[in-house]
């Protein structure tokens, strides 16, 4: 999963972390049938936390050798598991097929509140290649420092640009520069700040 380079010695190599075995099950390099290798990760200063696009769980490693899996499945998505992509068919068709499947996007660590944000993209029949697909809805799964799900919020399409976001002292900022948003202005970069709301027990 990761490569390393020692800038003092010039040594380079690969870490011992590997994709889950399910990703190697039916790959066929001869006939170009491969899994989507998309990976997102964040670092807490102690652990590297890994999210795969077609995998419900996240993986945590403190030594780049051993990993522990934690459930991070969206309640809005069906079970996500690796689907083979056929490299012999049209790229656009492959993208449309993938767009209909449960999929996880980026993973972010909030050092101020010690939580993680995992973005889940809702399946959509109208995914277009080379587009941000502004109509697509998404959700954000929130996990605590022990990698337990503590909440999830769903966001509508045509409102936010989920790929434009960052963590600040006040909360999670998500851009409203969605081209389908009625308030969209290409001359202004607008973000909305979202904060955690804890329910009283």
Model-predicted segments: where are they?
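Loop/turn-rich, solvent-exposed surfaces of beta-rich toroidal or solenoidal domains
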Residues: 97-145
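Structural signature of eukaryotic scaffold interfaces centered on beta-propeller domains
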Residues: 30-45, 99-113, 165-169, 178
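Residue-level signature of beta-propeller blades and closely related beta-rich strand-turn architectures
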Residues: 54, 122-124, 178-180
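Loop-centered beta-sheet repeat module
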Residues: 1-61
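Beta-propeller blade signature
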Residues: 1-11, 55-59, 131-149, 186-200
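Hydrophobic beta-strand positions that form the internal "hydrophobic ladder"
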Residues: 48-49, 116-118, 172
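C-terminal structured domain segments
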Residues: 138-180
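Surface-exposed loop and turn segments in beta-propeller and other repeat-based domains
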Residues: 11-34, 68-99, 153-159, 167-168
């Amino acid at each position: 999963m990761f490569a390393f380079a020692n800038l003092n010695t010039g040594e380079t190599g690969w870490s011992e972390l590997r994709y889950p075995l399910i990703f190697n099950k039916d790959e066929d390099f001869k006939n170009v049938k491969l899994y989507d290798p998309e990976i997102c990760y964040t670092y807490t200063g102690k652990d590297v936390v890994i999210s795969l696009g077609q995998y419900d769980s996240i993986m945590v490693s403190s030594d780049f050798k051993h990993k522990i899996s934690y459930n991070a499945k969206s309640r809005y998505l069906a079970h996500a598991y690796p689907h083979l992509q056929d490299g012999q068919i049209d790229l656009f068709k492959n993208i449309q097929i993938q767009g209909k499947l449960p999929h996880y996007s980026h993973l972010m660590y909030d050092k101020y509140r010690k939580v993680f944000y995992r973005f889940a993209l809702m399946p959509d029949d109208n995914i277009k290649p080379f587009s941000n697909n502004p109509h697509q809805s998404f959700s954000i799964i929130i996990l605590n420092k022990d990698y337990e799900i503590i909440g999830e919020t769903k966001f509508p399409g045509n409102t936010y640009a989920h790929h434009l976001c960052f963590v600040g002292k006040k909360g999670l900022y998500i851009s409203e520069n969605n081209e389908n948003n009625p308030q969209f202005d290409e001359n202004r970069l607008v973000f909305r700040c979202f904060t955690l709301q804890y329910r009283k027990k």
